[in-house]
Regions:
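Structural preference for beta-strand elements that scaffold enzyme active sites
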Residues: 11-15, 47-48, 78-84, 125-128, ...
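Active-site mouth loops of central-metabolism enzymes
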Residues: 20-32, 96-111
């Protein structure tokens, strides 16, 4: 494993997104197995772990923070623990055809969230505290002011925003410097490349979630793939039979590049972004130790600037299906 900087925070070049251990991909994973997986990640040199207060199971809506905190307790002094605040779910909105994600960044809510997360994680500080989604009702400057206070109090060391626009970034950073922005990013979802110039100018890192487009880019799925009950991929556009046909050229390109580099398709999907910018850190999730090792190995794959440019040119040219992306939030 090698390491890079998000702002002035040093993390492993590949992190571990932990949401899928508790939710969204069928039944929750076995807790003992996931604790062992997280320990294995530490042994592989992964130091960057991502969770959130709202990642949970039907029995415990905050399960993921408890799981991750317990697993990392023996390693706490050598890992970077990231969690998130600022949303809750209102499932009744689904009946109205709306997103169930409701942003809430009122200062009192933020303070309650940080204290609850510290308790669930079993730690005295959070290394990186993200605003999970921008709240249009609360000015960015007000949220940043609360973050500055939490840093002074020692409850958090760094802060960031997830799914942020350039305006959000500039306004927040002017009050309390951001360490990272976490947005959806993959070969199939590149719209956030437009904020790279401002990140470079301000010295902010970029954390890429869903770097495999929820698994499509690993090449492990085809038009016959079926998903378990409760697996959100069953409803994602990129997994339909028509989409798989539409994405055939992209998957062929990945297999070709993988063969040339002695790698896997998934490793190429990660190496592409790692070699594109030195401040990009992907956080793929997994429940499997073999996939974890494969993802960690992507940090050692070298693509030249010419390789990356050639891949980008191909991505710009080729047909590609719709991909599950940012959802509209309740205003």
């Amino acid at each position: 494993m090698n390491y890079r900087k998000l702002g002035n925070l040093t993390v492993s070049s590949v992190g571990l997104g932990c949401m899928g251990m508790s939710q969204s991909y069928g039944a929750p994973a076995d807790k003992k197995e996931m604790r062992e997986l997280i320990a294995a990640a530490v042994d592989m040199g992964i130091t960057f772990f991502d969770t959130a207060e709202v990642y949970g199971t039907p029995d415990d809506p905050h399960d993921n923070e408890r799981l991750v905190g317990a697993a990392l307790a023996p390693h706490r002094n050598k890992v970077v623990l990231a969690t998130k605040f600022g949303i809750h779910f209102d499932m009744s909105l689904l009946k109205e055809g709306k997103s169930p994600i409701v942003p809430d960044a009122r200062p009192a809510v933020i303070r309650a969230s940080v204290d609850a997360s510290l308790q669930r994680l079993g730690t005295d500080h959070i290394d990186l505290f993200y605003q999970h989604r921008v709240d249009p009702k609360i000015p960015a400057e007000e949220v940043a002011g609360v973050m500055a206070d939490l840093i002074k109090e020692g409850k958090i060391l760094h802060w960031g925003i997830s799914e942020a626009s350039e305006e959000d970034i500039r306004r927040a950073h002017a009050v309390c410097p951001l360490t990272a922005v976490q947005n959806r990013y993959s070969m199939m979802a590149r719209t956030h490349e437009r904020i790279f110039p401002v990140l470079e100018k301000l010295g902010i890192g970029f954390v890429a979630f869903s770097p495999f487009a929820n698994g499509v880019l690993t090449g492990a799925y085809d038009r016959t793939s079926a998903f378990a009950e409760g697996d959100m991929r069953a409803r994602m556009p990129q997994f339909s039979a028509a989409a798989m046909a539409e994405n055939a050229e992209l998957l062929t390109l990945l297999r070709k590049l993988a063969a040339e580099k002695g790698a896997t398709s998934g490793q190429i999907a990660l190496a592409w972004m790692l070699c594109k910018k030195p401040y990009i850190v992907p956080i793929p999730g997994t429940r499997k130790r073999a996939r974890l090792a494969e993802n960690a190995g992507a940090a050692d794959i070298q693509l030249s600037a010419g390789d990356v440019a050639a891949i980008d040119a191909e991505l710009d040219r080729m047909p590609m299906s719709a991909v599950f992306g940012e959802v509209r939030m309740k205003k």
